[in-house]
Amino acid sequence: MTTSFYFLLMALGLLLYVCQSSFGNQHTRNSDTPKYRCGSEIPNSYIDLCFRKRNDAGKKRGRASPLWQRGGSLSMLKARAKRNEAFHLQRAHRGVVEHCCHRPCSNAEFKKFCG
């Protein structure tokens, strides 16, 4: 009886794993789904999307990103976003605030504002 119980338990676990891996991604959000970015989300997205490749390359060589070396840069970006300034993230007279806060934009659209 215990062998059949363990077999049934393993089969149930395998079935749950297969169902989750097959159907589990239906309700997850695609990373490039357009979304609204306002306030402090703008500098956070800017740092994440524009400096991710540079930071990953620096990690491979053991160097930190220049933004992390200067601790004040991150807080400066966040402070500017709180004051609703469209700082240096502008493209052809349309700032990132107008483009991604007033209507949703994808990661690919946001990366166009990387300088």
Swiss-Prot record:
Q: Which residues carry this modification: 4-hydroxyproline?
A: 34, 104
What residues bear 4-carboxyglutamate in this entry?
41, 98, 109
Under Gene3D superfamilies, the record lists: Insulin-like (1.10.100.10)
Compartments annotated for it: namely: Secreted
Database matches in Pfam families = Insulin
Q: Give the species this sequence originates from.
A: Conus tulipa
Propeptide residue span(s): 25-29, 53-94
Q: Name one GO molecular function term.
A: hormone activity
Query: In which tissues or organs does this protein occur?
Result: Expressed by the venom gland.
Q: What is this protein called?
A: Con-Ins T1A
Query: Where does the record place the modification Cysteine amide?
Result: 114
Q: List the disulfide bonds.
A: 38-101, 50-114, 100-105
This protein's record includes keyword Ubl conjugation: no
Please give the superkingdom of this protein's source.
Answer: Eukaryota
* GO CC annotation, single: extracellular region
Briefly state the protein's biological role. Answer: This venom insulin, from a fish-hunting cone snail, facilitates prey capture by rapidly inducing hypoglycemic shock. It is one of the smallest known insulin found in nature and lacks the C-terminal segment of the B chain that, in human insulin, mediates engagement of the insulin receptor (INSR) and assembly of the hormone's hexameric storage form. Despite lacking this segment, it both binds and activates human insulin receptor (long isoform (HIR-B)) with a high potency (EC(50)=12.0 nM).
Q: Which UniProt keywords apply?
A: Amidation, Carbohydrate metabolism, Cleavage on pair of basic residues, Disulfide bond, Gamma-carboxyglutamic acid, Glucose metabolism, Hormone, Hydroxylation, Secreted, Signal, Toxin
Chief subcellular location:
secreted
The region annotated as signal peptide is 1-24
Q: What else is known?
A: Is possibly an allelic variant of Con-Ins T1B (AC A0A0B5AC90).
- Describe the subunit structure: Heterodimer of A and B chains; disulfide-linked.
Q: Family, per the entry?
A: Belongs to the insulin family.
* A single BP term in Gene Ontology: glucose metabolic process
